[in-house]
């Protein structure tokens, strides 16, 4: 992507914490970072896997563990460099300023989804789980209108602009999104906790810089920003 920098391909779920942390990393390490976004999983040219396959240059990927597992299987990752960074549960977003719905129980979630004219979900890891696991388990697939968006940001934009009544997605993509409010987490019985991980890309031209970046993101120094973005870090805070 860019010469003279550590090139990162990142999915939306970890982006809020990442953006908060990069100025400190660049300042303390002297390493410049260049960032490009992509989806953890799914179809289309903007998934991280598709970008790597067509030759987009990257040193580090940050994405869901499910998406990273696919990259590892495709030999796109330097063996042994993958590190788990954070866990994030799924939550519900509604248009800012509207009454927050009851999301405290499975039945409340089911009522909310059946009432919604349109439900926005990301096309990536969480959306795949919602469409193939949760919605069928609730027995509502044939009764709801699901709009899968290429990125989580598109899902919150749909809700903010009135194109969807609710979005179900990682909490980290809701808390700082413009035009939406966080209504709450999915109940524990139907929760999906997503893990975001990082790894060095095979063929990286700066393995040292890439490794230092991942070590920083996995360290206790990054924990506060990760928590503020709605995730739970794997690292223990100082």
Regions found by a protein language model. Give the residues of each.
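Exported/periplasmic ABC-transporter solute-binding proteins
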Residues: 1-46, 53-57, 65-66, 70-74, ...
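Phosphate-/polyanion-interacting regions in eukaryotic proteins
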Residues: 62
